[in-house]
Curated annotation (Swiss-Prot):
Function: Part of an ATP-driven transport system TP_0034/TP_0035/TP_0036 for a metal.
UniProt-recorded name of the protein: Probable metal transport system membrane protein TP_0036
Compartments where found: Cell inner membrane
Membrane topology type: Multi-pass membrane protein
């Protein structure tokens, strides 16, 4: 399997995704904003459609449009403070509307199925460099703003009182999430990308350990999910994103069962 260059590229890409998605997903889950990943992933579909119709690399189109959608979500929070789910519905409507309009217009001649469902055949060396650049940007930004993001995740109002520039940090977080999505969609697919942001984190939370240990556990579960999903999708000839999502849910169910059995014995 590893004698093929495309599989080696796919494993490197999966490793980067396994590091990035839980890092961003932890922030979303703790803020009870898990569906934001799904909304932004659909925003990336519109970005890919716009980029392909304009002859731009789809990865960059995905990043810039998804970042714009993320900024729009934060902007709308000021008008719908108690209705975050409504904001996501508005953004989903905008993104899907743009994507469907362009896809049905005949302006797009390329096949974008690989972006919808993921593919291990289309990750080139150029894509890896783009993913690496976006990964460095995401990890570096989150590391610089780690403490502020942690305060916001647990109690935004108290963080504001303590002097944290919540609005600015939220905009930065939206851009980082957008970069993560742009780096991941080619191998995971737009339709199931949000599962890699949230399910490994949900699995790690079952262990009931501290924040840093939970984050480390989420990394490990994410790597396990993506590795198994990639290997099985290769041998079964199915889309890697969908199978990885199935694996992640199965692992979550197993961890829940094992932790419940362990607690019942104590």
């Amino acid at each position: 399997m590893l004698q093929y260059a495309f599989m080696r590229n796919a494993f490197v890409a999966s490793f980067l995704i396994a590091l990035l998605c839980p890092l961003v997903g932890m922030h979303l889950v703790l803020r009870r904003y898990a569906l934001m990943g799904d909304a932004l992933a659909h925003g990336s579909l519109a970005g890919v459609s716009i980029a392909v119709s304009c002859g731009i690399h789809p990865g960059w189109g995905s990043f810039f449009f998804t970042a714009l959608v993320g900024v729009l979500i934060e902007f709308l929070r000021a008008f719908f403070k108690n209705h975050h789910d409504l904001i996501l519905s508005i953004v989903l409507s905008l993104s899907v509307g743009i994507a469907v309009t362009l896809l049905s217009s005949g302006l797009i001649q390329a096949d974008i199925d690989s972006y919808l469902f993921g593919s291990i055949l289309v990750v080139s060396t150029r894509d890896l460099w783009i993913m690496l650049a976006l990964s460095v940007f995401c990890v570096g930004t989150l590391a610089l703003r780690y403490h502020q993001l942690l305060y916001l995740a647990f109690d935004e109002e108290t963080a504001r009182i303590c002097g944290v520039a919540a609005d600015g940090i939220n905009y930065v977080a939206s851009v980082v999430i957008s970069a993560t999505i742009a780096a991941s969609i080619k191998i995971t697919g737009i339709l199931v990308l949000s599962s890699l942001m949230t399910v490994p984190v949900a699995t790690a939370l079952q262990l009931r350990v501290g924040f840093l240990l939970t984050l480390v556990a989420a990394f490990l579960f994410s790597m396990l999910d993506t590795a198994l999903g990639l290997v099985f999708s290769y041998y079964l000839n199915v889309a890697p994103g969908g199978f990885t999502a199935l694996v992640s849910v199965v692992v979550l169910m197993l961890v829940i069962a094992l932790t419940q059995v362990g607690r019942a014995r104590t």
